[in-house]
Amino acid sequence: YDEMQTLGDNKAPVPTKNEIFGNRECEDIDLKRCYRTPKEILVTAHALGLGIYRDVRKPIVNMIEDIKVWESIGYEVVDGELKYGSYVKLDRKQIYPNLISDPIRFQKFANSTQQYEYVTNEIKQLIENEEVLADDILIIDLDDKNIKSNSMKFKEIFYTTLEDNTNFFNNGQWLKTINVVDKGNPKLFKLENSIAYTTIYRAKGNEANIVFILNCDAISSLESTSRNCLFTAMTRSKFLVYILDSNGTTNYEEEIKKVKDNNYVLEFNYPTKGELKKIRTNSKSEITVIKSMDTAIKSFRNAVEHNKKLELELLLQQTGKDNIDELLQYLKEMKDKPDEW
């Protein structure tokens, strides 16, 4: 049971052994080796999922509560102590060498069109020059609410770019389609000679050699469940992962660089039990406030784009008075305590 792959707003409690197996006698077997995801991707996914290298005084937004789990999943202490409230440095063994030096590629774009054009050209290069199979590529769109319109826009750019390219084929076969896996097509995830395009909720439990994570700006960098989405998406990859920001608003690039500069080791101060409780509480309140902020920002952008006057009444209609008050209080606290963010 993986706490960091919980994708809903409310985390379910980790079930006990008795809740799963009853009173039957059983033996614990720790699976310390990960044969799917390379060390570089897995450690970076943990760092991003927990917020370990965020550039703030209190970076942690999520944490594995049972400290014994770290050793169970293959990490070992190389410095400090693995206990609540202490400094610790965790490393893990490289099970097999990665064939490329940079398996995590982050890119920012000014808009989604540039993002989709980049993905199209990367896929073209991978299939034509690297002999990658189309069905070894997985596209995960973190903007799950807009997957229908996003996938249509991507397919239009993809097919328009490649329609005149008579050399674009895969082992003698033409690339058949972009296979959108959503509510209308929930089961046919992997089709021969097709690229799957899906949400993180459909991608969970699946894997691919190469994973493109689109629209990572659609999730909050503060919210623990959002970072769980990013962690889960990254760990679908067996070889190479692309993390793409469609409007240049995230700071994941700096966090990824810190992991690499630290030789893919996790180095942080483990939260105290009291801090762990506060992290859980803050996570729930942030979800409500951040959703209100997202709604307000979208309303503002829409008004500006259409040259309309943005009035307070519009915000009240979109978010509700209670959420406006909470949003203002939240922003005031951030202004008063900048060193905590």
What are these regions (language model features)?
Residues 1-340:
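Conserved helicase motor core of SF1/SF2 NTP-dependent helicases
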